[in-house]
UniProtKB/Swiss-Prot annotation:
GO molecular function: ligase activity; oxidoreductase activity
Annotated PANTHER family: BETA-ALANINE-ACTIVATING ENZYME, CARRIER DOMAIN-CONTAINING PROTEIN
Keyword flag Mitochondrion: no
PROSITE patterns: AMP_BINDING (PS00455), CARRIER (PS50075)
Sorted UniProt keywords: Ligase, Multifunctional enzyme, Oxidoreductase, Phosphopantetheine, Phosphoprotein
Keyword Acyltransferase: no
Gene source species: Aspergillus hancockii
InterPro entries: ACP-like_sf, AMP-bd_C_sf, AMP-binding_CS, AMP-dep_synth/lig_dom, ANL_N_sf, Far_NAD-bd, NAD(P)-bd_dom_sf, PP-bd_ACP
Domain of life: Eukaryota
Signal peptide residues on this chain, from the entry's feature table: none
Domain writeup: NRP synthetases are composed of discrete domains (adenylation (A), thiolation (T) or peptidyl carrier protein (PCP) and condensation (C) domains) which when grouped together are referred to as a single module. Each module is responsible for the recognition (via the A domain) and incorporation of a single amino acid into the growing peptide product. Thus, an NRP synthetase is generally composed of one or more modules and can terminate in a thioesterase domain (TE) that releases the newly synthesized peptide from the enzyme.
Protein name: Non-canonical nonribosomal peptide synthetase hkm10
């Protein structure tokens, strides 16, 4: 009896099988993503905790639960939790529009969704449970926990949507039996405990079932690979080596792409399963010449057969013959070829492939008609008990060889696979024609002749008589709004659609015409470029012509690579060709940032000229700097409760600054705080005390009774030992109960490099203090400026407190060095939080004066702005801009309250106005200031304001004038780029404050408060 048959006999579901692996080796790594990993025990604990939350409702057996979670560890946690509770996972691509997600879940009558932080504010109309990135101690899970619930292998574990637009998509039922079968036949031998299986496929793909569940039920490990990593071949190859990946399921186009520049990157692996498109023989030959994996497998399988059902181990003999079959049925699956009447056909004749066995789905949900047509019984095929097999009609035309292998011929219908996605061409045609711009339209998959470029969807369309000149652009926008990204075709306008002799669309003629045009375009462009002495622009144009099938004879500087239909795979190919042609590196991120021909030529020229300060170089430097804390050892032992009577010793940085002074004053007033050690730049303690005293006196905060509690610590952030010396550093590390890190260099005109020593290296040094000796919480004060102008650059509508920072990276080049340093410092801390460092992050908006006394910082930007605008009689009219004003006393009291609870650790908190209505726009604020000061300050254009500012004798804003006047992109300055600011979600903050109703309410910066500020500034 095989292992699979033994498991069938035991009939334990996926949850129990994972649980058994956890019991056998709880400390084994279950899943890793960068520096963040979960052991089997940790994954079990998190899944159990989430299952309990899910099961508090009237949860029923096989309840469909939507998963709207980004690719990574939390998605695996969500799936295990749902199965632990006895439900069914409905894996959904978070990139889908809300409308499509709603339709899919409503058709399943789903009531619940699991979401992560980036997706929790989408407003999806279902009962929502957040998958939190929190460590759950295994000790908190009772030994008599009901999870996982007892399930059989016939339990419906997943619903995978396949094919078509949302209204036409089919939800394929997957049962545990099918997944266990895949895990034990991968495809010729099982996944084993020593394997590391790559998880690079979207969880909306059935292939991701193999990525996640094959290792989990077999006791192996999962290594998460992002899409960006897969498309950056250098990073992809490094990830294989770093994680020691041994097994991977990958789409054929990615394999083909790797073959162009790194054909040997799979040589260390045990199994590589490729599918989605036909094997590219020249590309595969390169891989075999460079060193293939032990098993290079051409795998075939529609979703209805759970990942794959036929497979062929590719051999040199296959490559010599020029044809790689889709192999034979694997494991306990069976296959046959039938004619249109459902009767078997002889070997060598074309027919439809039918597949049966443990991998076949029970059918689609709520689609009895499609089930009757697609899932049938063949009387001549029976099992050992004489029962006819449940067979799936694949719709694929194949031929069976005498040795039992199957050769793929084509499709009965016009369903195709593009980059691993199955696409109904008719669904695209429907949306295309619904635009009303075309009288006829045909969508096809066309294979590109360019090396490694793969296939593309092309729509051939005849313009309607009333179509506007913008028909193609408008139609593309309509398609983008209605369909997933992989279903958006390149639209080619034709005079008529050719027909065959049988009055059917002549798809072959259309494909030939498209390829001829592509080849003609390539030749035309290449003929225009001399072999030597050609400009960078012309050489890049030739490279574009070898990749893109566009009707353009000569590209202009404003032509956009992606606007012309370039895909992410083609972008990777372009990067490789640029490297080969120009002997210079341009990263994928740089290409996305500079995707027009003119921009890209400029980037290539600058790289060749040795220019170092390009946007991409800066971004790579920032990313590298986020990793300088990775060598720090994770603190051990429980985190000190700093509010205990026997503790109360605070280490504070930045105490001489505006926020630090108010926070220090608040802490010195607290009876439970016994001493505050302040890191201060001073040659001796006496000078240090004077500096601290002066900082508090500046805002009328100093009290003589503070002196016994005040401990000056003379040092500096940039020094590894904080300027204290190693011995004193270790003494303070043991002395301190908690750390508040507010110290930073803040200069709006200096670059990142100037901020790096204090703000980045200094943060690492403070973290080192926190994890030296006793494990102490670190509370870090950042700013909402760490996101940069993400609203205008990324179109970000909402910034989540615990959301990923990486999506905002491409907004940072357009902000000042301080904001850039805050992003780096936060991402550095985020990496440490993932390693369970006890850290909390606080992001205030623009901090204004005290709500009672009016005491404010006369040197901050807002105070300088008030003085300058009052002097010149105008202010810049900036629509849709807010500063998110928060009074200083609200900021410090909020920080102290939140920091007093250990629940704050591992989270970020936006300290901003609680509601949008309490955050006035800048234009309204400046207008109100004019009324209160009795001056006539009028809104003017930003350019006019800068001109007025440049000629005034008022020096308030002169130090900031270079930053204010510098144009950074598209004619806009840094301040102008904060138009259409996102909402800074503050759920964590409001939840924490709700636990203490005695805290004062948020003091909105309104007319009364502005009057206090103006009075204070007038006296100072």
């Amino acid at each position: 009896m095989s292992t699979f048959e033994s498991l069938l006999a035991r009939n334990e579901g996926l949850g129990q099988l994972f649980y058994q692996q956890m019991l056998e080796d709880p400390d084994a790594i279950a899943i890793v993503d960068g520096d963040y990993s979960l052991t089997y025990a940790s994954l079990h604990a998190q899944a159990t905790h989430l299952a309990q939350r899910l099961d508090q409702n009237d949860f029923v057996h096989e309840e469909p639960v939507g998963i709207v979670v980004q690719h990574g560890i939390l998605d695996a946690v969500a799936q295990v939790a749902i199965i632990y509770a006895g439900g069914t996972c409905v894996t959904l691509d978070p990139a889908l529009p809300n409308q499509q997600i709603e339709r899919r879940l409503n058709r399943l009558r789903a009531r619940y969704i699991l979401v992560d932080t980036p997706n929790k504010s989408r407003g999806l109309p279902f009962s929502q449970i957040e998958v939190e990135d929190l460590p759950i101690s295994t000790e908190l899970i009772p030994t008599d926990s009901p999870y996982p619930v007892n399930l059989s292998l016939e339990h419906r574990s997943h619903l995978i949507h396949t094919s078509g637009t949302t209204s036409e998509s089919k939800a394929v039922q997957i049962v545990g039996r099918s997944i266990v079968h895949v895990a034990n036949y991968a495809p010729f031998e099982p996944v084993v405990k020593t394997d590391v299986v790559a998880h690079g496929n979207s969880t909306s793909f059935d292939v991701a079932l193999f990525d996640i569940w094959a290792p989990l039920v077999q006791g192996a490990s999962i290594a998460v690979l992002s899409k960006a990593t897969l498309l950056d071949l250098s990073a992809f190859e490094a990830a294989i080596d770093r994680y020691k990946i041994s097994v991977m399921a990958i789409t054929a186009p990615l394999v083909n792409l790797a073959a162009t520049t790194r054909p040997g990157m799979f040589s260390s692996m045990r199994v590589v399963l490729m599918g989605g498109e036909a094997v590219n023989i020249p590309a595969m030959r390169k891989i075999f010449e460079a060193g293939p994996p032990v098993h290079m497998v051409n795998a075939y399988g529609p979703t209805e057969c759970c990942v794959y059902c036929l497979a062929r181990k590719i051999t040199l003999e296959d490559l010599d013959t020029g044809a790689v079959s889709i192999g034979k049925a694997i494991g306990n699956n069976i296959a046959t070829v039938c004619d249109e009447m459902g009767k078997p056909v002889p070997d060598g004749e074309e027919g439809e492939l039918l597949v049966g066995g443990p991998g076949v789905s029970p059918g689609y949900v709520n689609l009895p008609g499609k089930n009757a047509a697609s899932f049938i019984e063949v009387p001549d095929l029976v099992d050992a008990n004489g029962t006819p097999y449940h067979m799936y009609r694949t719709g694929d035309l194949v031929k069976r060889r005498p040795d039992g292998q199957y050769d793929f011929v084509g499709r009965f219908d016009h369903q195709v696979k593009i980059r691993g996605y199955r696409v109904e061409l008719g669904a695209i045609e429907t949306v295309l024609m619904d635009t009303g711009y075309f009288s006829e339209g045909v969508v096809m998959k066309v294979d590109s002749k360019a090396e490694g470029a793969g296939s593309a969807l092309v729509a051939f369309a005849v313009l309607a008589p009333t179509a506007p000149p913008s028909a193609v652009t408008d139609a593309t926008a309509a398609l983008t709004a209605a369909l997933p990204h992989y279903m958006i075709p390149n639209i080619h306008i034709v005079e008529s659609i050719p027909l065959t002799n049988h009055a059917k669309v002549d798809r072959k003629q259309l494909a030939d015409w498209c390829l001829q045009r592509q080849e003609k375009n390539m030749c035309a462009m290449q003929d225009k470029v001399p072999s030597e002495g050609a400009s960078t622009r012309d050489q890049l144009g030739a490279l574009w012509a070898t990749i893109l099938a566009t009707p353009v004879r000569e590209y202009s500087d404003n032509d956009d690579f992606f606007g012309l239909g370039g895909t992410s795979l083609q972008a990777s190919l372009l990067i490789s060709l640029i490297r080969r042609t120009f002997n210079t590196e341009v990263s994928l991120l740089a290409l996305y940032d500079n995707s027009t021909l003119g921009q890209l030529a400029h980037i290539v020229d600058r790289n060749q000229g040795g220019a170092l300060a390009t946007v991409q170089n800066l971004r790579e430097m920032w990313i590298a700097d986020t990793m300088i804390g990775d060598a720090l050892e994770t603190p051990v032992g429980p985190v000190v409760d700093w509010r205990r009577d026997t503790e109360g010793r605070v280490f504070l940085t930045g105490a001489t600054g505006f926020v630090g002074a108010f926070l220090l004053s608040d802490m010195l007033k607290m009876p439970g705080i016994h001493q505050v050690g302040c890191l201060v730049r001073a040659p001796d303690e006496a000078t240090g005390v004077r500096r601290l005293r002066h900082a508090l006196e500046k805002y009328n905060l100093w009290r003589e009774e503070y002196l016994p509690k005040l401990l000056p610590l003379c040092g500096k952030l940039e020094d590894p030992w904080l300027g204290l010396g190693e011995q004193r550093f270790r003494e303070i590390a043991d002395w301190a109960s908690v750390i508040f890190h507010l110290g930073a260099l803040v200069n709006y005109t200096q670059p990142y490099s100037w901020h790096r020593p204090a703000n980045i290296e200094g943060t690492v040094n403070v973290v080192r203090l926190a994890c030296t000796g006793r494990s102490k919480a670190l509370h870090y004060c950042s700013s909402i400026s760490c996101f940069g102008p993400t609203g205008i650059i990324n179109g970000t509508k909402v910034v989540h407190e615990d959301g990923a920072l990486m999506p905002h990276l491409n907004a940072l080049p357009y902000d000042h060095g301080y904001a850039q340093s805050q992003w780096v410092a936060e991402e550095l801390l985020r990496r440490l939080i993932h390693r369970r460092f006890p850290i909390a992050v606080y992001r205030p908006g623009f901090i204004t004066g005290h709500s009672e006394t009016g005491a404010c910082n006369p040197d901050d930007f807002f105070s300088r702005l008030i003085r300058a605008c009052s002097s010149i009689g105008c202010y810049p009219g900036l629509p849709n801009q807010r500063k998110e004003f928060v009074p200083i006393d609200y900021v410090t009291s909020t920080m102290i309250h939140i920091a007093s609870s250990s629940l704050s650790l591992g989270h970020a908190f936006h300290i901003v106005p609680p509601t949008r209505e309490e955050s006035p726009e800048m234009n309204d604020t400046m207008s109100l200031i004019g009324e209160l000061t009795g001056t006539s300050i009028q809104p003017v254009s930003y350019r006019e304001w800068i001109e007025q500012l440049s000629s005034t004798k008022d020096l308030s804003l002169q130090p900031l004038l270079p930053m204010l006047a510098e144009v950074v992109i598209d004619g806009m300055t840094r301040w102008e780029m904060y138009e259409n600011m996102p909402t800074y979600e503050n759920t964590n903050t409001l939840r924490a404050l709700a636990s203490c109703p005695d805290l004062p309410k948020f003091p909105m910066v309104d007319e009364a408060l502005l009057r206090k500020y103006l009075d204070y500034l007038a006296d100072h």
